[in-house]
From Swiss-Prot:
Signal peptide as annotated in the record: none
One Gene Ontology cellular component: cytoplasm
Catalysis: reaction(s): 5-amino-1-(5-phospho-D-ribosyl)imidazole-4-carboxylate + L-aspartate + ATP = (2S)-2-[5-amino-1-(5-phospho-beta-D-ribosyl)imidazole-4-carboxamido]succinate + ADP + phosphate + 2 H(+)
InterPro entries registered for this protein in UniProt: SAICAR_synt/ADE2_N, SAICAR_synth
UniProt entry keywords in alphabetical sequence: ATP-binding, Ligase, Nucleotide-binding, Purine biosynthesis
Family per record: Belongs to the SAICAR synthetase family. Highly divergent.
Protein species of origin: Archaeoglobus fulgidus (strain ATCC 49558 / DSM 4304 / JCM 9628 / NBRC 100126 / VC-16)
Entry protein name: Putative phosphoribosylaminoimidazole-succinocarboxamide synthase
The keyword Ribonucleoprotein is assigned to this record: no
Pathway note: Purine metabolism; IMP biosynthesis via de novo pathway; 5-amino-1-(5-phospho-D-ribosyl)imidazole-4-carboxamide from 5-amino-1-(5-phospho-D-ribosyl)imidazole-4-carboxylate: step 1/2
PANTHER family listed in its UniProt record: PHOSPHORIBOSYLAMINOIMIDAZOLE-SUCCINOCARBOXAMIDE SYNTHASE (PTHR43700:SF1)
Amino acid sequence: MGSVKDLVVLKEPAEKPGLGRFIFSNRYSVFDYGEMPDKIEDKGRALCMVTAYFFEKLEEAGIATHYLGLVEGGKVRRFDEVENAVNEMEVKLVRVIKPKNGDYSIFKTLKGNFLVPLEIIYRNSIPEGSSLLRRIERGEAKPEDFGLTKIEAGMRLERPIVDFSTKLEDVDRYLSHSEAKEISGLSDEEFEALKELVVKVDEIITREVSKAGLINEDGKIEVALDDERNLMVVDAVGTPDECRFSFDGFEVSKELLREYYRKTEWYDKVRQLKGQEGWREAVGLPPPLPDEVREGVSNLYRAFCNEVTGRKFFDAPKLKEVVSQLKEVLE
């Protein structure tokens, strides 16, 4: 399925939805490399529980999702019904159709029940080192594209910027809104509804994580059209892998792992070779994480899950303590 979760297909999707189960693993991936050498203990269960929590919050707000429930003891249950953290989730399946050689014309012919081939990104702030700043520097985007006169590092935005990238290509690339609409297979009305949808999801994530003292900086969602062409949120949502959060100014997201690897010689090779044919083999195996970093990140996922969902699934220190320990280890 992917580098961080596995898919068990119970019924293949066609024009009507299929049925499947996600198995959230302890694997992680950075820089589109694929599976990294270490496992982050309890990450899979933590992400599964957080995703279920947010899918149910979205449904309460009238937002459709492909979520059907968590699997515990062979039974499908709601979040409040499970006794322990699990790593398995039952979902409706849609078709995932990969464009051939960059040709997205097939998406204009599909009636429904397919993954929209976009990552939909919201940005509530512009941190130092943001990819958006780099794109503006290179002339690939400009503030006016997002309804702003300027975009600077450290900005907090009054309303979120909505941004797009490809989802089903070997290396994701950012898209203008017109490019995103063109490849998506969506009508004008559906595309406008998609932009409104990501803002609503952003608001719900912001509200929920603020209870744990976290700030929602930016994040991404994936969306599908169901068999009646209604938009629904799919995959995973509201987790530190999908979003970038901060706690007392400290990064709480997968970005921590990226930052660690940016200091390695392995990353220098990734930066030089990424996107070329066979680049993953050419860069070689990444170095493993030091034990204290691996354990600190593991506790970060555990504490995030406990405090955002309001249920103590994991025996872990408080988020504040975990952040303090990680600061010492990483800085």
